[in-house]
Design a protein with these regions (language model features):
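Short coil/turn segments at beta-strand junctions that form active-site/ligand-binding loops
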Residues: 1-2, 96-97, 145-148
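Active-site neighborhood of HAD-like aspartate-dependent phosphohydrolases
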Residues: 1-38
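Conserved Rossmann-like nucleotide-cofactor binding loop
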Residues: 10, 17, 106-107, 156
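Conserved SAM-binding loop
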Residues: 11, 98, 150-151
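A metal-dependent, Asp-based hydrolase signature
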Residues: 28-31, 41-74
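Short, acidic loop-to-helix structural element flanking the phosphoryl-transfer center
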Residues: 73-99, 133, 137
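Substrate-recognition/cap helix-loop segment adjacent to the acidic, metal-dependent catalytic center
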Residues: 91-99, 103-127
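Asp-based, Mg2+/Mn2+-dependent phosphohydrolase catalytic module
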Residues: 114, 119-150, 154-198
């Protein structure tokens, strides 16, 4: 069995913790949370660059601080936002069985991956700026005789992959309060039962 994991809000506590950390660092630099949140809603659907985000906010606020210093203060804390419980499970599964496929701005996502130190637990890591479909399909095709379990917190990415094209794919919506082992066991047994009925 092979496993594909998303990064943000699966392996990396992005929304509840890291984003809060970003806002606190910006406030410390003199950028109000309201201004930062408002601007974030304008740019979040595009390929996000934290460096550009900080630079624009500094420029708009006429704040004389170095973007690089604020960026470094934010990014240096990346290891503190890892879902260590899930990372332990990934380590148990083995590097050769695990892939990481994440959506976002390439430079920013890659920097989060590098600074958090998680890449060493995966046979391959992919940063995509559009659909995950192509990469997921490629992984499924490479392991067509095995089940490929795909964890993502966002239904749009889970639903993006055609089960007709990837019959060995088991998509699972990840929620932080669920027991990982139990989730895999239940979903895998359910899919095996469905396959027997066909």
């Amino acid at each position: 069995m092979k496993y594909i994991f998303d990064f943000d809000d699966v392996l990396f506590n992005n929304t509840k913790q890291f984003k809060e950390h970003i806002y606190k660092c910006l406030e410390k630099a003199g950028i109000s949370r309201t201004v930062a949140e408002t601007y974030y809603t304008e740019v979040r659907e595009k390929e996000f660059s934290l460096k550009n985000f900080i630079s624009t906010l500094l420029k708009r606020g006429k704040i004389d601080k170095k973007m690089e210093d604020i960026y470094e203060e934010i990014m240096s804390e990346c290891p503190n936002f890892i879902n260590n419980e899930l990372l332990d499970e990934i380590e148990r599964l083995g590097k050769n069985n695990c892939y990481l496929v994440t959506y976002g701005g390439k430079e920013f996502q890659q920097d989060k991956l590098d600074r958090s130190g998680v890449s060493i637990y995966f046979s391959q890591t992919y940063v995509v700026t559009e659909s995950k479909n192509e990469i997921i399909s490629m992984i499924c095709a490479s392991h067509k005789d095995e089940q490929v379990v795909f964890f993502d917190d966002k239904p749009k990415f889970l639903n993006d992959v055609s089960l007709k094209d990837c019959p060995n794919l088991v998509p699972i919506q990840y929620k932080e309060d669920l027991d990982f082992r139990e989730l895999v066991r239940e979903k895998t047994l359910h899919n095996l039962e469905m396959a027997r009925r066909r």
